[in-house]
Amino acid sequence: MADVVWAVRHGERRDSVDPDWETVAERVHDPPLTELGRWAAWRVGRRFVEREPPVDAVYASPFLRAVETAAEITAETDARFMLEPGLGEHRNADWFDAEPETLPFERLTARFERLSADHEPLVTPGFPETHAEAMTRIGRTTRQIADATDGTALLVGHGATIGGVVAGLVGSADAVDAPLCGLTRLVSDDDGWRLDFSGDTTHLDV
């Protein structure tokens, strides 16, 4: 079982800065990172190289912004990562008219050399889902990952992912902060899981 779980939100996404995104997008709800977003993700990777103990397992939401964030991190840490739909975005009916489209797995594995083809998804999200259902789904996924990992796990996802990860392990997301490429750390000891810190972005202060 894992003794440390890290969670990180993806970097800046293109549709947040490009007013023309919806007119040019192949998949309107699956934008890539901006250059700034890739830089911030790279800085997360540098933090793990320079300041933190090694990570034993990396899982990412299948949305492109999270995949690209994981790819930047693992390029620095010389690791591989796995796609886990259970860490994906909240399927909020106010945001999406239907299940949001992401790149097929085959296209992702062809594009990202550090993406492992060996992982079988643990949890498949339903559409639509309430906020409570999304938190439950992400929490269940997190506990399964923690149970399957020896050592340290890093989970790459969305703002909702960070809340679900923390709530799934400690029972509440009240202390969660989820800025772009902010890091949250949870630690397990004899008394169970505790939230060490949330939303740390000191690695971006360069």
Across the structure, where does each feature detected by a protein language model lie?
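Acidic, low-complexity terminal tails and accessory targeting/binding regions
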Residues: 1-3, 90-104, 167-206
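Active-site-proximal alpha-helix that buttresses catalytic centers in soluble enzyme cores
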Residues: 2-83
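Phosphate-handling substructures
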Residues: 31-32, 77-137, 196-198
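Active-site signature of alpha/beta-hydrolase-fold catalytic machinery across serine-
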Residues: 72, 164, 168
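Generic beta-sheet signal
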Residues: 5, 149-159
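Alpha-helix capping/helix-boundary segments
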Residues: 65, 161-162
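Glycine-rich phosphate-binding loop signature in dinucleotide/nucleotide-binding domains
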Residues: 51-54, 145-151
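Short beta-strand scaffold positions
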Residues: 60-61, 136, 156-157
